[in-house]
Amino acid sequence: MSEETGEGASGGPRGGPVLVTGGSGFLGVHCVLRLLEAGHRVRTTVRTPAREETVREMLRTAGAEPGDALDVVVADLTSDEGWAAAAKDCAYVLHVASPYPPTVPRHEDELIVPARDGTLRVLRAARDAGVRRTVLTSSFASISYGHAERERTYTERDWSNLDGPHLSAYAKSKTLAERAAWDFVEREGDGLELSVINPVGVLGPVFGPDYSTSITLVQRLLDRDLPGVPRLSFCFADVRDLADLHLRAMTDPAARGERFLGSSGGPMWVADVAHVLRDRLGPPAARVPTRRIPDALIRLASRMDATLRGFVPDLGLVRGANADKARDVLGWRPRPPEEAIVATAESLLRLGLVKSAASQYT
């Protein structure tokens, strides 16, 4: 047994449960599932008592019946209540929870304050409970936004420019929350270790109606909510691989004090995603649009659509993510983005979450 990782030869855990914040979220529930599969006891937080059944139902959809191996507790990022009890006796914390509004917030502080202050609440509770290491889920948005270059590949050495133009409230919230986390551990951590994962767009199997914005892209393509595809590009990673990356960062001594970009390949245009759906899914994706919408039309439509307005500065922009560090240091081996796209679509269809194509899928 490694004294540094606390893992036995079989990969099983030693000591108390692992705390996962935000267990009802898309990435959070996949982290819970991966930990359970590895033999860990898991404690996860939800915002309200009613969300416990949501977590367990999603795990049942994934084929898991954790029973007593999973403890669900109530703790909200906007309140101190519940966090000390949540972190008690835990050796590790995966802080996955983060506010993400369904619509553009009226003021950026609606996102920034709970993201930053919530992260600090979790870290204080972890420190006070004697947690060995916290793995923070940050974002590619804390690395690659606010820069002047129209085409650039980013690494963990980069940070988003908070003084740059067109910086969204979400990008600010993730950048400020991550910087606050590093500052806290350096100044007040009292031995608490920190590792950070910076995922790109998250795709992969969904277990219920709570999922990432990237999943919504696939859903809207299948539903033909858009008459064509905007000139936007994204990097993607499969949620299962990102859960695996969190576990690797949790126990590997080399992950201490490090950031890791989580991306499975280079940037893909939305048109590329549409073609993957058409080529790999057959009839359910036969009507997925592939014609590009002119930038001028997107700009015109954005005057009446706040969500669309947020994408206008990114038209034609290519942000690459170099994930060599996760591969080289942690031995991470993500699946190709095309597999993540197909798994996303198949799960949406299977759960009846695609309006126009669900009846065609068997």
How should each PLM-predicted stretch be described?
Residues 16-40, 45:
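N-terminal Rossmann NAD(P)H-binding glycine-rich loop of SDR-like oxidoreductase domains
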Residues 49-50, 60-117:
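NAD(P)H-binding glycine-rich loop region in Rossmannoid oxidoreductase-like domains
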Residues 95, 99, 103-170:
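Conserved Rossmann-fold NAD(P)-dependent oxidoreductase catalytic core, especially the SDR/UDP-sugar
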Residues 104-105, 161-167, 202, 209, ...:
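A conserved pocket-lining segment of Rossmann-fold NAD(P)-dependent short-chain dehydrogenase/reductase
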Residues 165-194:
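Active-site Tyr-X1-5-Lys
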Residues 188-192, 204-217, 249-260, 284:
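Glycine/proline-rich active-site loop of Rossmann-fold NAD(P)-dependent oxidoreductases
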Residues 245-310, 328, 337-362:
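Mid/C-terminal beta-alpha module of Rossmann-like enzyme folds, strongest
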